[in-house]
A protein has these predicted regions:
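Generic alpha-helical transmembrane segments of integral inner-membrane proteins
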Residues: 19, 23, 27, 31, ...
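Helix-terminus/linker motif at the lipid-water interface of multi-pass membrane proteins
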Residues: 23, 27-45, 114-121, 177-188, ...
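Small-residue-rich hydrophobic transmembrane alpha-helices
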Residues: 44-107, 141-160, 258, 271-335, ...
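Short loop-to-helix capping motifs
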Residues: 120, 156-157, 265, 384, ...
């Protein structure tokens, strides 16, 4: 067992590159939005609504990445490299099947998909063109997401970071080229953003394959892509399926919150949009350490070091709590700068809401940090993704969303108090999460002995 100082170095070594990857993902979205803003509001709306479809695919990828990460980390800790490669081949096969389904739907029926989200003819037309092009990125995106989750699970963090940086540069360069018609290319508008994304995803796969061909750690092998999986497939789905449902449930609840705020007024929506953006940047560190927790716990359990895994989980919880508090302090410190920046961009009412919302979302960040570390880090590291699915389904849809709805429409509380009720969601489920944590049933070695 590592001493506390060496453990902090090890955890930070895993977490910081993941934080960079998450930050880059945020920057890509910001860059797309800013550049599309120069095209038209219709282009921005079309891209945003079309991405609601791809968001469902992202949830599926995240579930597959969770199953890949947990199983690979445990078998890597056990020293079973062959099974790690079998898991990678299985996950890539599943991701390709899912990607093909989403590709066929978006490529052949883009108008039908867009009509689910809007009835604006201009937005439907632009979004349909966007979907037809970006659908080609799905197969590449699925491959790279699964491959990089496998690398992270065995502690190979730098390649995913480098890949994301290269992808960001390629994406931004291609977007600028195709949106503004640089270097002699025609101006493609929103279609150019989709084309830039496709090229960026192809670049990611190219880097992954080059690494795989020259790696002595883990390789993507065609024979495992087509091999029968049997019990390994069942183990994979047992972890991945609840993770997917968990993320979908959480995402729909977030959309329900947004709908409630949207019916209160535009000032609430605008203030919440800024507050969420700010707190998401602050949460990058928490999520980085949460992902590191999954890797650390899984590897120790794979080694059958149950007590060590439990102690490391306790240490990661303390680290994540400290990081969350630091994030809160930083956000509160820059709060005056944020308010000054938006002073001439928001109405006086929206600005007054934003001033209070930033405070509320920062203390909610502490709750999110704790729950994410335990549910997504410790519990999933032990192969227990089912608990998170159950607790989020119950507390989000039977407690948090109804409570916010009642506060807004039945008790008709002032908007700020409605927002306060909404931010209680992380703390409402926390007692149950801690009870599950202290029972330690999640400390499980889920590996098997294969020939």
């Amino acid at each position: 067992m590592l001493n506390k100082k060496d453990f902090l170095k090890y955890a930070s070594k895993l977490a910081f590159p993941i934080m960079i990857q998450n930050l880059i993902g945020t920057l890509v979205n910001i860059a797309d939005t800013v550049m599309l803003g120069y095209v038209s509001q219709t282009a921005m709306s079309a891209s945003s609504l079309a991405n609601q479809y791809t968001f469902i695919l992202f949830c599926l990828y995240y579930g597959m990445a969770t199953g890949t990460s947990v199983l690979c980390a445990q078998y890597w800790g056990k020293g079973d490299k062959k099974t790690v490669e079998r898991i990678l081949g299985l996950a890539e096969r599943i991701s390709l099947i899912v990607s093909l389904i989403f590709f066929v739907i978006s490529f052949t029926m883009p108008v039908t998909v867009m009509k689910i989200f809007t009835n604006s003819p201009d937005t439907i037309a632009a979004g349909s063109e966007y979907l037809k092009v970006i659908s080609f990125s799905f197969m590449f995106m699925g491959f790279s997401q699964v491959f990089m989750s496998a690398l992270r699970s065995i502690g190979k963090i730098m390649l995913p970071s480098i890949t994301y940086i290269v992808s960001l540069c390629v994406n931004v360069l291609c977007n600028a080229t195709f949106i503004f018609g640089l270097f002699g290319f025609p101006k493609l508008g929103v279609t150019g953003v989709a084309l830039g994304t496709v090229i960026a995803r192809i670049t990611e796969v190219f880097i992954c394959l080059i690494y795989s061909l020259n790696s002595s750690d883990v390789r993507f092998r065609i024979k495992y892509f087509f091999a029968k999986s049997g019990i390994l497939f069942q183990d994979f789905m047992k972890i991945a399926t609840p993770a997917v449902i968990n993320d979908v449930v959480w995402s729909f609840a977030t959309s329900a919150f947004a709908a409630i705020l949207g019916h209160i007024g535009d000032d609430m929506v605008a203030a919440n949009a800024v507050a969420v953006m700010v707190v998401n940047i602050g949460a990058i560190a928490c999520r980085g350490f949460s992902n590191a927790t999954t890797i650390i716990i899984s590897q120790e359990l794979g080694k059958d070091q149950i007590d060590t895994a439990g102690e490391y989980g306790k240490r990661m919880l303390r680290i994540t709590l400290a990081v969350s508090l630091i994030g809160c302090v930083i956000i509160l410190a820059i709060r005056p700068l944020i308010l000054d920046f938006y002073r001439d961009k928001l109405t006086e009412t929206a600005l007054s809401y934003l001033s209070i919302f930033i405070i509320m979302t920062t203390w909610r960040l502490v709750g999110e940090g704790i729950n994410t570390c335990l549910i997504c880090g410790c519990f999933r590291g032990g192969g227990d993704s089912r608990f998170g699915m159950i607790v989020d389904s119950i507390f989000m849809w039977l407690v948090a969303v109804p409570a916010t709805f009642l506060a807004a429409y039945v008790f008709k509380l002032p908007p700020v108090w409605v927002y306060f009720v909404m931010t209680l969601d992380e703390f409402e489920k926390m007692p149950v999460v801690f009870i599950h944590y202290f029972r330690k049933k999640w400390l499980t070695n889920i590996t098997r002995d294969f020939d």
